[in-house]
Every structure is written in structure tokens, then in C-alpha cells.
């Protein structure tokens, strides 16, 4: 499936993006190549191939859920102009 300049302009319009006229032919060529590759992948025989979430049979090693950093809230909030109950107070912007 070949994408022409008019289709690139239509896609750009639908995506609400501006494309320079001199770049349209390059985008048309690139999109045509992408669609050809997708078509090629669609023609691959995947019967009997087990779906997988990851190409390697690996598990994520999780560390124990332990506190590793000290609580520095008061230190960080010491420079704030207004704090209440551990929360930063900011000026009201909506009445």
C-alpha cells in the first residue's frame, strides 16, 4: 500500500500537525515503508508459536520492601513559607 502526498496531508490534518510542503514526500516514503513492513509481519506464519510477554524467560528480582531512606520531611519543609500538618500551604487560586 503506497501513501501519496494527499494522504500525508490528510493524516497531518487529522493529527492536527503542520508539515512543511518539502517534507511531505519524505513522510509519504517513510509511511509507505512502515506499512510495507507491517504487511510483511502480518504474512509471517505464527501458528504454533506460544505468545509471550518477554523474549527471555526471566523474572524480576524484587528487593524486600524496607525503608532505606530517612524521613527528611521537616528538613525539606523548613524552607517553605507555610506548612501545616506536614503539607505545603499555597495561596488559594480559586474562590
Swiss-Prot record:
Entry keywords, A to Z: ATP-binding, Ligase, Nucleotide-binding, Protein biosynthesis
Keyword Secreted on entry: no
Stored InterPro entries: Asp/Glu-ADT_sf_sub_c, GatC
Keyword Lipid biosynthesis assigned: no
Pfam families with a match to the protein in the record: GatC
Gene Ontology molecular functions: asparaginyl-tRNA synthase (glutamine-hydrolyzing) activity; ATP binding; glutaminyl-tRNA synthase (glutamine-hydrolyzing) activity
Broadest EC class assigned to this enzyme: ligase
Reactions accelerated catalytically: L-glutamyl-tRNA(Gln) + L-glutamine + ATP + H2O = L-glutaminyl-tRNA(Gln) + L-glutamate + ADP + phosphate + H(+); L-aspartyl-tRNA(Asn) + L-glutamine + ATP + H2O = L-asparaginyl-tRNA(Asn) + L-glutamate + ADP + phosphate + 2 H(+)
GO biological process annotation, one example: translation
EC id: 6.3.5.-
Function of the molecule: Allows the formation of correctly charged Asn-tRNA(Asn) or Gln-tRNA(Gln) through the transamidation of misacylated Asp-tRNA(Asn) or Glu-tRNA(Gln) in organisms which lack either or both of asparaginyl-tRNA or glutaminyl-tRNA synthetases. The reaction takes place in the presence of glutamine and ATP through an activated phospho-Asp-tRNA(Asn) or phospho-Glu-tRNA(Gln).
Family indicated by similarity: Belongs to the GatC family.
Subunit structure: Heterotrimer of A, B and C subunits.
Stored HAMAP family: GatC (MF_00122)
Protein name: Aspartyl/glutamyl-tRNA(Asn/Gln) amidotransferase subunit C
Species for this entry: Halorhodospira halophila (strain DSM 244 / SL1) (Ectothiorhodospira halophila (strain DSM 244 / SL1))
Phylogenetic placement of the source organism: Bacteria, Pseudomonadati, Pseudomonadota, Gammaproteobacteria, Chromatiales
Gene designation: gatC
